[in-house]
């Protein structure tokens, strides 16, 4: 598959600024995804988290992983179908994510049955694991 640029990402995700946390999908095939989030100093959360030492909030890294997870289903969902976050298991944060980092988002579909799904995810910066989590989601008409 060709990489999906932001225009394509916005066709799949219902999110809009300031909550789009996937900038590009490098690959999405066989239930596995590799996506990118370019973390810039202009992110709206940095002035408050933290003013003297900006760090991307862990919950937003998890949200980025959840958004990337939706591309595990690329081409399988009916138009107007949305994935809703249903749970997060085993979230661990191992490295700070700061302005200038390129956050690589990896997701692998474990299952999708009766509108419920689960992905195993990790986020990396410079080849180091920044976060890991299992994402649970429900798929329904938006």
Swiss-Prot record:
Active site: residue positions: 49
UniProt catalytic activity: a (3R)-hydroxyacyl-[ACP] = a (2E)-enoyl-[ACP] + H2O
Subcellular location: Cytoplasm
EC number: 4.2.1.59
Protein's job: Involved in unsaturated fatty acids biosynthesis. Catalyzes the dehydration of short chain beta-hydroxyacyl-ACPs and long chain saturated and unsaturated beta-hydroxyacyl-ACPs.
Family per similarity comment: Belongs to the thioester dehydratase family. FabZ subfamily.
Name used for this protein in its record: 3-hydroxyacyl-[acyl-carrier-protein] dehydratase FabZ
Protein's organism: Deinococcus geothermalis (strain DSM 11300 / CIP 105573 / AG-3a)
């Amino acid at each position: 598959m060709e990489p999906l640029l932001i225009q394509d990402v916005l066709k799949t995700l219902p999110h809009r600024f300031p909550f789009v946390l996937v900038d590009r999908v490098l690959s999405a095939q066989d239930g596995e995804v590799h996506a990118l989030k370019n973390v810039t100093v202009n992110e709206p959360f940095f002035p408050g988290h933290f003013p003297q030492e900006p760090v991307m909030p862990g919950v937003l890294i998890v949200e980025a992983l959840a958004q990337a997870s939706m591309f595990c289903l690329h081409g399988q969902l009916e138009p107007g179908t949305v994935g809703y976050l249903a749970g997060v298991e085993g979230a661990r944060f191992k490295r700070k994510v700061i302005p200038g980092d390129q956050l690589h988002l990896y997701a692998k579909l474990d299952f999708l049955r009766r509108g419920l799904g689960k992905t195993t995810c990790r986020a990396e910066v410079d080849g180091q694991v920044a976060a890991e989590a299992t994402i649970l989601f429900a798929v329904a008409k938006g």
